[in-house]
A protein has these predicted regions:
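Conserved pre-catalytic core of RNA-dependent polymerases
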Residues: 1-186, 190
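Alpha-helical recognition domains of nuclear gene-regulatory proteins
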Residues: 10-13, 69, 73, 99-102, ...
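Structural motif
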Residues: 47, 56-57, 140, 177-179, ...
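Active-site palm subdomain of RNA-directed nucleic acid polymerases
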Residues: 66-81, 183-219, 228
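Non-catalytic, peripheral interaction segments enriched in hydrophobic/basic residues
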Residues: 69, 215, 243, 247-259, ...
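Catalytic palm subdomain of template-directed nucleic-acid polymerases
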Residues: 119-136, 211-240, 257-258, 290-293
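Short, conserved micro-motifs composed of acidic
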Residues: 161, 245-280
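Acidic catalytic cores of enzymes that act on phosphate-bearing nucleotides/polynucleotides
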Residues: 370, 384-426
Length: 426
């Protein structure tokens, strides 16, 4: 027998008797510093790390098999953009942009609230998840497997070459597991339903577009401040049923539209904590700016690009050829500038600013102060300028958006907008 046949018999037997080996429930957790944190400051704390669980390979193969056979039971709302094939942060960002553009073009101001959850993945209730799965009429054999699996789940912390003692996980879900993101999406799916049912969010052609999710990143979109306050309370109430809490200190409100300069009273959580209005907020890696129309700041992207280029140049700039350094710049540095640009509008001034940053770095690489020489070198090494890269990314993204999302309950509203933008790029 081949190894795959042995695994198939083992997995079928496990599902039949509702049992998983003890090793399947064991993992070790590696703390990784969050993106916005700096490892070289003195104020780093445990809250600045995200734990990623490393599980046995065979258990991951089993999870893939479960997902292949029972994937229909783990389907989440169209308003959840995370953990789905052919769906990315760019799709969530583009949908948000289309919603805002729709209302701003009709002289309305859109009110946003980016809700931050406190340790959402770590606080997920196992019993609450089982209830939600039973409501979906999940097969008893699969439910029994998951119950045994979660009941015996243990992990330890790995720091460098040191391992801690194993301890039991009474709640939460392993970040890094194959099934984990799908189970979490099922768990928070009711938040979307409750917020949509309250009817306070933005609507386009009678379709509710008041809430967008990407994993545990929740964004509320409302036409008025009062409606935003109502949606926040509905969202918070449902989250409390799920044993989850909002972090007001990291949650942000933002206004985009004709009245964006008028600052209303802060909206508050159920316990009275205020969520302040800000001039910008970070959402899925991009920085949305309050203003008359939807726009994003590229300043953080430029700073990241400078850091990455200087790191590459300091390490190998004196020993490697220009071709090697330029290849690393193209593969490691340019993606920091291009991230999310396919989904957001970019002004000509922003393009000039970014291209100036790239030119300055290449002047340093080619040891020249002539812009013409840099342009010749870029052409010789087939290094595309920023504006060309953005147009290519936009065209590729919009083609996929139109092809894949016309059946999506939410995104189908904006397919015509995507087609019009695609035609303008040709």
């Amino acid at each position: 027998l081949q190894f795959c046949h042995v695994l198939a018999m083992l997995f079928n037997l496990m599902i039949k008797i509702g049992y998983v080996p003890g090793a399947f429930s064991q993992s070790y957790t590696v703390p990784l510093l969050k993106d916005h944190c700096n490892a070289y400051v003195k104020s780093v704390s445990a809250n600045d790390f995200r734990g990623i669980s490393i599980s046995p390979v065979i258990s991951k193969v089993f999870e893939h098999c479960i997902l292949e056979r029972y994937g229909a039971f783990f389907v989440s709302s169209d308003y959840q953009f995370g953990f789905k094939k052919r769906s990315s942060c760019a799709h969530a960002t583009y949908t948000l942009r289309c919603v805002i553009d729709y209302f701003v073009s009709r002289n309305s101001t859109v009110n946003l609230c980016a809700v931050d959850l406190s340790k959402a993945f770590d606080k997920m209730s196992h019993h609450g998840l089982f209830i939600k799965l039973m409501n979906r009429c999940i097969p008893v054999s699969l439910l029994r497997i998951l119950e045994v699996w979660f009941e015996r789940c243990t992990t330890c912390i790995k720091w460098g070459s040191c391992l801690s003692k194993f301890y039991k996980l009474n709640c939460g879900i392993r970040q890094g597991g194959v099934l984990s993101p799908y189970l979490f999406a099922v768990y928070v799916d009711s938040v979307i339903d409750k917020v949509r049912q309250c009817g306070a969010g933005c609507k386009i052609n009678m379709a509710s577009v008041g809430i967008l999710l990407y994993a545990d990143d929740i964004l509320l979109v409302a036409p008025t401040v009062t409606a935003l306050q109502t949606m926040l309370h509905v969202c918070e109430t449902e989250l409390s049923w799920l044993d989850m809490t909002i972090n007001p200190a990291k949650s942000v409100c933002l206004r985009i539209g004709p009245n964006w300069k008028s600052t209303p009273v802060n909206i508050s959580t159920l316990d009275g904590s205020d969520i302040s209005w800000q001039q910008s907020c970070r959402y899925l890696g991009i920085h949305i700016v309050a203003g008359r129309v939807f726009s994003c700041s590229l300043d953080n992207a430029k700073r990241s690009f400078y850091r990455a280029f200087n790191a590459v140049y300091c390490k190998i700039g004196g020993v490697a050829s220009e071709e090697v350094v330029l290849h690393l710049v193209k593969s490691k540095c340019m993606p920091l500038l291009l991230y999310g640009t396919e989904a957001i509008p970019i002004k000509k001034a922003q393009i000039r600013s970014v291209e100036y940053a790239i030119t300055c770095c290449l002047m340093k690489l080619f040891k020249t102060k002539s812009k013409e020489i840099v342009c010749e070198c870029m052409s010789f090494f087939n290094f595309c300028d920023f504006s060309t890269c953005v147009v290519r990314r936009k065209r590729k993204f919009l083609l996929k958006f139109v092809a894949n999302f016309w059946r999506n309950e939410l995104c189908c509203v904006f397919v015509d907008v995507a087609k019009a933008e695609l035609n303008s790029l040709r």
